[in-house]
């Protein structure tokens, strides 16, 4: 039975209007910190909390006094809409890297915040509640031994956070209840924090992606492809966007018959078209052939129309993301794959990418070997046993084959898995990233995510489990994480081809879980419209695009006309240490590498400027010398001798 994909409870309580802040977001200052990448809060405390009795002090002294007070505060800096729900003093954080540290634990409606003044600078741990997967009680009231009674939070970003409470203090129960309430608001009929957060940014990220503009950039509509509004009310397919691009010679009535033959009504629609050859990438779900091998004349005609729209080739490739054995097994459920007998001039290729359950188990194994400790002696064999990089390789290799067929083969391709919202999104978006330099810019990548993932119905709510306490839900899977990992692998192989840096990718992943922004909420465009997310929440792109300098790759050089062919072999892939092992202070560099790049480039620019100044000075001196040499006072008149 299909699980309900509704997200109506995500914002069950309308957010009250709050005074907008024009300050940008900022991270809490930390040194010995396992701080996740949070947005920034320029206002650390409200103005009411600062005494004004000494206003006669000089401004410098007042600032110094107030900054000292802020350093001593144990409460977290609060975002607009954020408020404290519980606080427990004398709690011990069992840090797996630096040992136990005692401090104050605070729960707000957005974050879990721990601060210890025992160290200099203060130790700060700051995690959004959205990243929490489950909360467990450790020990009972009669537990003996130091730090044997407390709570453990298991997080979606690889971490486990363990806190010890004193049994006599009775703070554990209160903290546990508030964590269960505010970390899982959907399970408690409460709104996600994104509906409470009201920060104002210079740019509205919800307006970043306009499908008409994006299709126009690709040259659509044209004589072979048209934009249809048949799905304007999401009646053809409730998981597809309102606007679809389909073959120009296929009328809307036939689209309905094609939809009845495709799983969930997800017909083949255009994702990308080559600007020269007109070869296309179209995406869809599996055909409903079943064990009896049913056929659909309308579906066969439709794929023929896709092939005919490309005059460069008289063949079409169908890339099925699944292993062939899985595709065959789907026939028993009414699904299946295209028969080459039924679809003339079509070649079917299976890409052997495993399903969401295999990927979830692979990530679980990866977490076991990277957090908290790494076993050096068996590191390579342990990593191999997770099969994580093997899955990354298969996804990249599949996207590479698609891109190569379109670019080198000038052949149109159709891509699908079972339902067309997981592996299909990985493959189409990665292939488009290889083919189109626009998507390798910051804004272009944001458009790519909006288009191929959000508008085409990747089930973010189900795959991530926003605000849902059911951590064992079989629908959870790291599909989008794998896509971002593949992008990172490409940036390693082509360090100057992407406008964005590693921090950009990590920030996207952190806010995939945080529930601070509305971008990744719900499962479809239709659901986001019903929830009115553009009006009730802030877009992640609003935040990112307000401080582009933080996310820009200083080595970027525009390669807009270049097609990237990454090497998809195990020898060229590596574990993304900057993400999966970033919490281990022994494994991360002293400073982010992109900051060092910026410093070196700034130094180079400074030296280039000096060279230019010296060249101008030399040129000026040379000109001055020439002028003096040719002046009348210095001129010697040649003597002509008459013979």
UniProtKB/Swiss-Prot annotation:
Coiled coil start-end: 593-627
Effect on the protein of changing residue 417 to S: Loss of phosphatidylinositol-3,5-bisphosphate 3-phosphatase activity. Loss of phosphatidylinositol-3-phosphate phosphatase activity
UniProt-reported outcome of changing residue 419 to A: No effect on phosphatidylinositol-3,5-bisphosphate 3-phosphatase activity. Decreased phosphatidylinositol-3-phosphate phosphatase activity
GO cellular component: axon; cytoplasm; cytosol; dendrite; dendritic spine; early endosome membrane; extracellular exosome; intracellular membrane-bounded organelle
Residues covered by region (Disordered): 1-56, 615-643
Main location: cytoplasm
Species annotation: Homo sapiens
Protein name: Phosphatidylinositol-3,5-bisphosphate 3-phosphatase MTMR2
Reported effect, residue 330 to D: Decreased phosphatidylinositol-3,5-bisphosphate 3-phosphatase activity. Decreased phosphatidylinositol-3-phosphate phosphatase activity
UniProtKB keywords: Cell projection, Charcot-Marie-Tooth disease, Coiled coil, Cytoplasm, Disease variant, Endosome, Hydrolase, Lipid metabolism, Membrane, Neurodegeneration, Neuropathy, Phosphoprotein
Binding, a 1,2-diacyl-sn-glycero-3-phospho-(1D-myo-inositol-3,5-bisphosphate): 330, 355-356, 418-423, 459, 463
Residue numbers carrying Phosphoserine: 6, 9, 58
PTM characteristics: Phosphorylation at Ser-58 decreases MTMR2 localization to endocytic vesicular structures.
Biased composition (Low complexity): 41-55, 620-631
Subcellular localization: Cytoplasm; Early endosome membrane; Cytoplasm, Perinuclear region; Cell projection, Axon
Membrane topology: Peripheral membrane protein
GO biological process: dendritic spine maintenance; myelin assembly; negative regulation of endocytosis; negative regulation of excitatory postsynaptic potential; negative regulation of myelination; negative regulation of receptor catabolic process; negative regulation of receptor internalization; neuron development
Annotated ranges, domain Myotubularin phosphatase: 205-580
Lineage: Eukaryota, Metazoa, Chordata, Craniata, Vertebrata
Record-linked SMART domains: GRAM, PTPc_motif
Domain (GRAM): residue spans on this chain: 68-139
Positions of the catalytic residues: 417 (phosphocysteine intermediate)
Subunit annotation: Homodimer (via coiled-coil domain). Heterotetramer consisting of one MTMR2 dimer and one SBF2/MTMR13 dimer; specifically in peripheral nerves stabilizes SBF2/MTMR13 at the membranes and increases MTMR2 catalytic activity towards phosphatidylinositol 3,5-bisphosphate and to a lesser extent towards phosphatidylinositol 3-phosphate. Heterodimer with SBF1/MTMR5; acts as an adapter for the phosphatase MTMR2 to regulate MTMR2 catalytic activity and subcellular location. Heterodimer with MTMR12.
Domain remark in the UniProt entry: The coiled-coil domain mediates homodimerization. Also mediates interaction with SBF1/MTMR5. By mediating MTMR2 homodimerization, indirectly involved in SBF2/MTMR13 and MTMR2 heterotetramerization. The GRAM domain mediates binding to phosphatidylinositol 4-phosphate, phosphatidylinositol 5-phosphate, phosphatidylinositol 3,5-bisphosphate and phosphatidylinositol 3,4,5-trisphosphate.
């Amino acid at each position: 039975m299909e699980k309900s994909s509704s997200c109506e409870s995500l914002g069950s309580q309308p957010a009250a209007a709050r005074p907008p802040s024009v300050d940008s977001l900022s991270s809490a200052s930390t040194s010995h910190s396992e701080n996740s990448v949070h947005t920034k809060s320029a206002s650390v405390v409200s103005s009411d909390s600062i005494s004004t009795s000494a206003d006669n002090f000089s401004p410098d002294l007042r600032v110094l006094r107030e900054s000292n007070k802020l350093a001593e505060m144990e409460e977290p800096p609060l975002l607009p809409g954020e408020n404290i729900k519980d606080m427990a003093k004398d709690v011990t954080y069992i840090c797996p890297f630096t040992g136990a540290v005692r401090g104050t634990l605070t729960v707000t409606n957005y974050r879990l915040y721990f601060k210890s003044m025992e160290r200099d600078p203060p130790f700060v741990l700051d995690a959004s509640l959205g990243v929490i997967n489950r909360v467990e009680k450790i020990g009972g009231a009669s537990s003996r031994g130091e730090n044997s009674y407390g709570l453990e939070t298991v997080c979606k970003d690889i971490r486990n956070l363990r806190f010890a409470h004193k049994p006599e203090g009775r703070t554990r129960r209160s903290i546990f209840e508030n964590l269960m309430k505010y970390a899982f608001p959907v399970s408690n009929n409460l709104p996600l924090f994104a509906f409470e957060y009201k920060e104002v940014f210079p740019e509205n990220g919800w307006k970043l992606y306009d499908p008409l503009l994006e299709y126009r950039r690709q040259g659509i509509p044209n004589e072979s492809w048209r934009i249809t509004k048949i799905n304007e009310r999401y009646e053809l397919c409730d998981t597809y966007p309102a606007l679809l691009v389909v073959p120009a010679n296929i009328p809307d009535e036939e689209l309905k018959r094609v939809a009845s033959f495709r799983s969930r009504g997800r017909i083949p629609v255009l994702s990308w078209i080559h600007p020269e050859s007109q070869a296309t990438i179209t995406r869809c779900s599996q055909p409903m052939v079943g064990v009896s091998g049913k056929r659909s004349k309308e579906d066969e005609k439709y794929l023929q129309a896709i092939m005919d729209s490309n005059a460069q080739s008289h063949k079409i490739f169908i890339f099925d993301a699944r292993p062939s054995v899985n595709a065959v097994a789907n026939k028993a459920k009414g699904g299946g794959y295209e028969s080459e007998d039924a679809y003339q001039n079509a070649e079917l290729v299976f890409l052997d990418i495993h399903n969401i359950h295999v990927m979830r188990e692979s990530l679980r194994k990866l977490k076991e070997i990277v957090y908290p400790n790494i076993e050096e002696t068996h590191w390579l064999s342990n990593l191999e046993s997770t099969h994580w990089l093997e899955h990354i390789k298969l996804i990249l290799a599949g996207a590479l084959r698609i891109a190569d067929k379109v670019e080198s083969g000038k052949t149109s391709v159709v891509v699908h898995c079972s339902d067309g919202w997981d592996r299909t999104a990985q493959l189409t978006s990665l292939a488009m990233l290889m083919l189109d330099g626009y998507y390798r810019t910051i804004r272009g990548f944001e458009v790519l995510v909006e288009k191929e993932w959000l508008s085409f119905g990747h089930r973010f709510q189900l795959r991530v489990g926003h605000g849902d306490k059911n951590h064992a839900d079989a629908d959870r899977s790291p599909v989008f994480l794998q896509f971002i990992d593949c992008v990172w692998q490409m940036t390693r192989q082509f360090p100057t081809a992407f406008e964005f840096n590693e921090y950009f990718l990590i920030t996207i992943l952190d806010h995939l879980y945080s529930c601070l922004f509305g971008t990744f909420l719900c499962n479809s465009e239709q659901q986001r419209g019903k929830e009115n997310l553009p009006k009730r929440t802030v877009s992640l792109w609003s935040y990112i695009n307000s401080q582009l300098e933080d996310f820009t790759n200083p080595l970027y050089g525009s390669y807009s006309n270049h097609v990237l062919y990454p090497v998809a072999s195990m020898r060229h892939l590596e574990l993304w240490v900057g993400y999966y092992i970033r919490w281990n202070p022994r494994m991360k560099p002293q400073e982010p590498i992109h900051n060092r790049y910026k410093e070196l480039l700034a130094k180079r620019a400074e030296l280039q400027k000096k060279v230019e100044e010296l060249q101008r000075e030399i040129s000026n001196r040379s000109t001055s010398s020439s002028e003096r040499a040719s002046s009348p006072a210095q001129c010697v008149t040649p003597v002509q001798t008459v013979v």
